[in-house]
């Protein structure tokens, strides 16, 4: 992995009681040892693989102002990180769910792009087996489950300040409040809505195939083409390029897909991040609620699965063997 660490700082927040978060600040930067580089590379890999929200700094953002001064050489990276950790502590203290953790600031370069990664990591206890096959206690940073993470694309921020996607963050698994306090700390608001862009793409694809008067099989083939392209981009960590997708769909209609979306006013960006859960709807129908979970391939609708919108009834012809076996055993009184 072509990742180079410029500067990295580590601090700690310790929750002493319900009211107080103690600040423990390092007096020096971390040395970019092999172990440190491997840790940052793992953070980069894990973060890049997750669905993210996009944002931009507000004009009043204290973090953005401090970062700008640091980038201009008016403040060193350690002082910047120490002051920012203090602001983070102040924001966290407003929320009853606030816990401590290891606060990490890392300025690094990956594939000619400069980033600032900010995260709060849990330092967890575990066990390890040593060379004598004895079991000893150990601690580790829970990188795989980190949900308080933000990354600023410094290259994008400085070369294209009008961008709505230079800042990315995770919304967190424990609810909206995690995103709220972190956005307050960053002094940021949501920017590009990747889910909305992906939903708009799906609607445009359906309308495009309808206007081209394709039959059901042809429509599904187009949806599969779109899914394959988007999934490849997702796996490669690349964005969906509207013009590239349009070339994939050449021959479907006399009008190109990119021309169609522009003429119909779908307001799709020239490129935008792929959203895995939204794109899955291209090839599958899925839903759950009221104790019922249903998931099936889109091509089965109208063939083995039929929906009557008037009665909101779904009819399935031919159940999966394992489900059929369970039903037969239950209805016959078996266990």
UniProtKB/Swiss-Prot annotation:
Where in the cell?
Cytoplasm, Nucleoid
Coiled-coil ranges (or none): none
- MF terms (GO), sorted A to Z: double-stranded DNA binding; single-stranded RNA binding
Highest rank taxon of the organism: Bacteria
Q: Give the chief site where it resides.
A: cytoplasm
In Pfam terms, one family for this protein is NA37
Keyword tags: Cytoplasm
Q: Name the InterPro entries on file.
A: Nucleoid_associated_NdpA
GO cellular component annotations, sorted alphabetically? bacterial nucleoid; cytoplasm
Q: Which family does it belong to?
A: Belongs to the YejK family.
Name of the protein this chain belongs to: Nucleoid-associated protein YejK
């Amino acid at each position: 992995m072509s990742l180079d660490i410029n500067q990295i700082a580590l601090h700690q927040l310790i929750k002493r009681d319900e009211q107080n978060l103690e600040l423990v600040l390092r007096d020096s930067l971390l040395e970019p040892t092999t172990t440190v580089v491997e840790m940052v590379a793992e953070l980069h890999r894990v973060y890049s693989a997750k669905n993210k929200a996009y944002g931009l700094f507000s004009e009043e953002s204290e973090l953005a102002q401090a970062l700008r001064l640091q980038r201009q050489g008016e403040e060193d990276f350690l002082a910047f990180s120490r002051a920012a950790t203090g602001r983070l502590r102040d924001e966290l203290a407003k929320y009853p769910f606030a816990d401590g953790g290891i606060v990490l600031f890392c300025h690094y370069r990956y594939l000619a792009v400069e980033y600032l990664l900010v995260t709060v990591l849990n330092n967890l206890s575990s066990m390890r087996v040593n060379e004598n096959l004895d079991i000893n206690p150990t601690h580790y940073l829970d990188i795989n489950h980190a949900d308080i993470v933000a990354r600023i694309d410094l290259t994008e921020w400085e070369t294209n300040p009008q961008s709505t996607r230079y800042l990315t963050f995770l919304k967190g698994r424990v609810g909206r409040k995690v995103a709220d306090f972190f956005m307050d700390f960053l002094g940021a608001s949501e920017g590009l809505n990747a889910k909305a862009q992906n939903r708009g793409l799906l609607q445009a694809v359906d309308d495009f195939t309808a206007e081209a008067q394709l039959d059901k099989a042809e429509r599904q083939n187009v949806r599969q083409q779109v899914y394959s392209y988007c999934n490849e981009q997702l796996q490669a960590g690349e964005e969906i390029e509207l013009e590239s997708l349009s070339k994939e769909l050449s021959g479907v209609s006399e009008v190109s897909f990119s021309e169609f979306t522009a003429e119909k006013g779908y307001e799709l960006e020239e490129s935008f991040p792929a959203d895995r859960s939204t794109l899955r709807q291209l090839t599958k129908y899925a839903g759950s609620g009221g104790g019922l979970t249903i998931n099936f391939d889109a091509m089965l609708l109208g063939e083995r699965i039929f929906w009557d919108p008037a009665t909101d009834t779904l009819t399935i012809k031919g159940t999966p063997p394992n489900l059929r076996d369970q039903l037969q055993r239950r209805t016959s009184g078996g266990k």
